[in-house]
């Protein structure tokens, strides 16, 4: 380990000598073709259940990747709120950066990083906007403070200080204290229509198991990929 001294107070800053040395072996077990159901959602459901049972923090958290009009990728963590044969659902401010990206380019990638279980799942697809009634039903299932929070933030816009948000939140909390919080016109959701899913399971000696499901009309083609 090397030490550097802070120019302000002389406190040593300890940094890894070489982050390339940070590694570990993956030993929790492999994934074999005989383990695979015909439908990737069945395996996803099994793995998600196991992630919940393992008490992972935020097991439904997924990295959502979009690209802007210049082709610049962006990522952020969003919570999965529903999935079925139609696709995977998340909600957002429709004035946000990701919503603008998806308006121009509906292609999207999701990644579920279940590190403790030595697993990850990547989903590729395209989005479609959710119907208003579906959005309304979910919005009113949220805690009331979260509903108010949706009104407060003009997501991805520049603000001068956190106090701007806190003041607006208190103002709206007072306004809606005795009634229902209406659905903001700028708040909605997307369904990711799935084109392909890749399941990754860590393996010993970096011989990881990767299986790629590709939609083929009514069925799924399954291929093993080299690690």
From Swiss-Prot:
EC class of the enzyme, as a word: oxidoreductase
InterPro entries (UniProt xref): Pyridox_Oxase (IPR000659), Pyridox_Oxase_CS (IPR019740), Pyridox_Oxase_N (IPR011576), Pyridoxamine_oxidase_dimer_C (IPR019576), Split_barrel_FMN-bd (IPR012349)
A GO BP entry: pyridoxine biosynthetic process
GO MF, one annotated term: pyridoxamine phosphate oxidase activity
Domain of life, per lineage: Bacteria
Cofactor(s) required for function per UniProt: FMN
Entry's EC annotation: 1.4.3.5
Keyword Oxidoreductase annotated: yes
Residues that, per the record, bind FMN: 76-81, 91-92, 97-98, 120, 155-156, 200, 210
Cofactor binding comment, as recorded: Binds 1 FMN per subunit.
Recorded metabolic or biological pathway in which this protein acts: Cofactor metabolism; pyridoxal 5'-phosphate salvage; pyridoxal 5'-phosphate from pyridoxamine 5'-phosphate: step 1/1; Cofactor metabolism; pyridoxal 5'-phosphate salvage; pyridoxal 5'-phosphate from pyridoxine 5'-phosphate: step 1/1
Residues annotated to bind substrate: 23-26, 81, 138, 142, 146, 206-208
PANTHER family membership: PYRIDOXINE-5'-PHOSPHATE OXIDASE, PYRIDOXINE-5-PHOSPHATE OXIDASE
Protein name according to UniProt: Pyridoxine/pyridoxamine 5'-phosphate oxidase
Organism of this sequence: Pectobacterium atrosepticum (strain SCRI 1043 / ATCC BAA-672)
Encoding gene, per UniProt annotation: pdxH
């Amino acid at each position: 380990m090397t030490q550097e001294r802070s120019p302000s107070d002389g406190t040593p800053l300890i940094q890894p000598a070489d982050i390339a040395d940070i590694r570990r072996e993956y030993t929790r077990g492999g994934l074999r073709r005989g383990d695979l159901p015909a439908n990737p959602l069945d395996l996803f459901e099994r793995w998600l259940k196991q992630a919940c049972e393992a008490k992972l923090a935020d097991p439904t958290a997924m990295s959502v990747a979009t690209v802007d009009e210049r082709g610049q990728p962006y990522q952020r963590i969003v919570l999965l709120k529903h999935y079925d044969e139609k696709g995977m659902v998340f909600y957002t401010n429709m004035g946000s950066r990701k919503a603008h990206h998806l308006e121009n380019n509906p292609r999207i990638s999701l990644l579920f990083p279940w590190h403790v279980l030595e697993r990850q799942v990547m989903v590729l697809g395209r989005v479609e906007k959710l119907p208003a009634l579906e959005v309304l039903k979910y919005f009113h299932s949220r805690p009331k403070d979260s509903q108010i929070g949706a009104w407060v933030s003009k997501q991805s816009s520049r603000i001068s200080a956190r106090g701007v948000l806190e003041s607006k939140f208190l103002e709206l909390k007072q306004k809606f204290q005795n009634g229902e919080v209406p659905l903001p016109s700028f708040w909605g959701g997307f369904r990711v229509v799935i084109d392909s899913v890749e399941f990754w399971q860590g393996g010993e000696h970096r011989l990881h198991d990767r299986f790629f499901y590709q939609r083929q009309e009514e069925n799924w083609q399954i291929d093993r990929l080299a690690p």
